[in-house]
């Protein structure tokens, strides 16, 4: 077995990189990652919380990889142990949070859109997820809202109002998925996890949403990483085989 190269880590996005979007990881990918860990240190970084990442990558995710960063690294595990947490509540404080949430709920209440359901704001430890239609809608309703939003720009308009109103809080607004957008302090994107990787001088990051506006963009562009854009889990395996295992995995 080849020895691990010191100072080198391969860091992976989850959705669209290690798994198909919102799907569970395949046994083949788990086996490949196990092989990869023999030659390089391996970490995963996802925007979702640990519960959702565990649903996709398995319950032993914090020990299957050397590093596991959930919520972009706001919750950080190394070798299965929790090494750091940061929360929106402690960062902003309850008064500012309440001001933002109250304004947002009033805005949604006055919004004239075809349907509304429930759970308009989901409070996560590192971000707020805001959905004008409400996260309790069905898949069919999601699809309909996405089409409606493309025409009427509901989310885009809402974000520009909130950005102006709460400019003093230095928040980042990231529109993603079909029905919602995320709100978090500036710098709390995936580059946040890099503070835990000071010992590595070569950080290879693999992600699918590396374009401007995508949630892999900042870490892909960071001067601390070597960025790789992938198109699917199969492409991830192919690129890693060539990069780290010295073989072409295209003909399997």
UniProtKB/Swiss-Prot annotation:
<dbReference type="InterPro" id="IPR005002">
    <property type="entry name" value="PMM"/>
</dbReference>
<feature type="binding site">
    <location>
        <position position="124"/>
    </location>
    <ligand>
        <name>alpha-D-mannose 1-phosphate</name>
    </ligand>
</feature>
<dbReference type="GO" id="GO:0006487">
    <property type="term" value="P:protein N-linked glycosylation"/>
</dbReference>
<dbReference type="GO" id="GO:0005829">
    <property type="term" value="C:cytosol"/>
</dbReference>
<comment type="function">
    <text>Catalyzes the interconversion of mannose-6-phosphate to mannose-1-phosphate, the precursor for the synthesis of GDP-mannose. GDP-mannose is an essential sugar nucleotide for the synthesis of D-mannose-containing cell wall polysaccharides (galactomannans and glucomannans), glycolipids, glycoproteins and the antioxidant L-ascorbate. Can complement the yeast temperature-sensitive mutant sec53-6.</text>
</comment>
<feature type="binding site">
    <location>
        <position position="225"/>
    </location>
    <ligand>
        <name>Mg(2+) 2</name>
    </ligand>
</feature>
<protein>
    <recommendedName>
        <fullName>Phosphomannomutase</fullName>
        <ecNumber>5.4.2.8</ecNumber>
    </recommendedName>
</protein>
<keyword id="KW-0460">Magnesium</keyword>
<comment type="similarity">
    <text>Belongs to the eukaryotic PMM family.</text>
</comment>
<comment type="pathway">
    <text>Nucleotide-sugar biosynthesis; GDP-alpha-D-mannose biosynthesis; alpha-D-mannose 1-phosphate from D-fructose 6-phosphate: step 2/2.</text>
</comment>
<comment type="subunit">
    <text>Homodimer.</text>
</comment>
<feature type="binding site">
    <location>
        <position position="13"/>
    </location>
    <ligand>
        <name>Mg(2+) 1</name>
    </ligand>
</feature>
<feature type="binding site">
    <location>
        <position position="220"/>
    </location>
    <ligand>
        <name>Mg(2+) 2</name>
    </ligand>
</feature>
<feature type="binding site">
    <location>
        <position position="208"/>
    </location>
    <ligand>
        <name>Mg(2+) 1</name>
    </ligand>
</feature>
<dbReference type="GO" id="GO:0046872">
    <property type="term" value="F:metal ion binding"/>
</dbReference>
<dbReference type="GO" id="GO:0009298">
    <property type="term" value="P:GDP-mannose biosynthetic process"/>
</dbReference>
<keyword id="KW-0413">Isomerase</keyword>
<feature type="active site" description="Proton donor/acceptor">
    <location>
        <position position="15"/>
    </location>
</feature>
<feature type="binding site">
    <location>
        <position position="15"/>
    </location>
    <ligand>
        <name>Mg(2+) 1</name>
    </ligand>
</feature>
<feature type="binding site">
    <location>
        <position position="180"/>
    </location>
    <ligand>
        <name>alpha-D-mannose 1-phosphate</name>
    </ligand>
</feature>
<feature type="binding site">
    <location>
        <position position="142"/>
    </location>
    <ligand>
        <name>alpha-D-mannose 1-phosphate</name>
    </ligand>
</feature>
<feature type="binding site">
    <location>
        <position position="135"/>
    </location>
    <ligand>
        <name>alpha-D-mannose 1-phosphate</name>
    </ligand>
</feature>
<feature type="binding site">
    <location>
        <position position="182"/>
    </location>
    <ligand>
        <name>alpha-D-mannose 1-phosphate</name>
    </ligand>
</feature>
<feature type="binding site">
    <location>
        <position position="22"/>
    </location>
    <ligand>
        <name>alpha-D-mannose 1-phosphate</name>
    </ligand>
</feature>
<dbReference type="InterPro" id="IPR043169">
    <property type="entry name" value="PMM_cap"/>
</dbReference>
<feature type="active site" description="Nucleophile">
    <location>
        <position position="13"/>
    </location>
</feature>
<dbReference type="GO" id="GO:0006013">
    <property type="term" value="P:mannose metabolic process"/>
</dbReference>
<dbReference type="GO" id="GO:0004615">
    <property type="term" value="F:phosphomannomutase activity"/>
</dbReference>
<dbReference type="InterPro" id="IPR036412">
    <property type="entry name" value="HAD-like_sf"/>
</dbReference>
<keyword id="KW-0479">Metal-binding</keyword>
<dbReference type="Pfam" id="PF03332">
    <property type="entry name" value="PMM"/>
</dbReference>
<dbReference type="InterPro" id="IPR023214">
    <property type="entry name" value="HAD_sf"/>
</dbReference>
<keyword id="KW-0963">Cytoplasm</keyword>
<dbReference type="InterPro" id="IPR006379">
    <property type="entry name" value="HAD-SF_hydro_IIB"/>
</dbReference>
């Amino acid at each position: 077995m080849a020895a691990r190269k010191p100072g080198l880590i391969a860091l992976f996005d989850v959705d669209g990189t290690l798994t198909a979007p919102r799907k569970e990881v395949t046994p083949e990918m788990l086996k490949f990652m196990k092989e990869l860990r023999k030659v390089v240190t391996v970490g995963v970084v996802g925007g979702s919380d640990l519960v959702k990442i565990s649903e996709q990558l398995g319950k032993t995710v914090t020990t299957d990889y050397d590093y596991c960063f959930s919520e972009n690294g706001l919750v950080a595990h190394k070798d299965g142990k929790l090494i750091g947490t940061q929360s929106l509540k402690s960062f902003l404080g309850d008064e500012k949070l309440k001001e933002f949430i109250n304004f947002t709920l009033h805005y949604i209440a006055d919004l004239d859109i075809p349907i509304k359901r429930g759970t308009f704001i989901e409070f996560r430890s590192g971000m707020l997820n805001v959905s004008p239609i409400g996260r309790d809608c069905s898949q069919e309703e999601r699809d309909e809202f996405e089409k409606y939003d493309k025409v009427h720009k509901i989310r885009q308009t809402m974000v520009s109002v909130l950005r102006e109103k709460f400019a003093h809080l230095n928040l980042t607004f990231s529109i993603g998925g079909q029905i919602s957008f995320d709100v978090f302090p500036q710098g709390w994107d995936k580059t946040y996890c890099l503070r835990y990787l000071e010992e590595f001088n070569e950080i290879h990051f693999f992600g699918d949403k590396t374009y401007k506006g995508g949630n892999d963009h900042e870490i892909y562009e960071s001067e601390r990483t070597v960025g790789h854009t992938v198109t699917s889990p199969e492409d991830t395996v192919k690129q890693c085989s060539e990069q780290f295992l010295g073989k072409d995995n295209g003909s399997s």
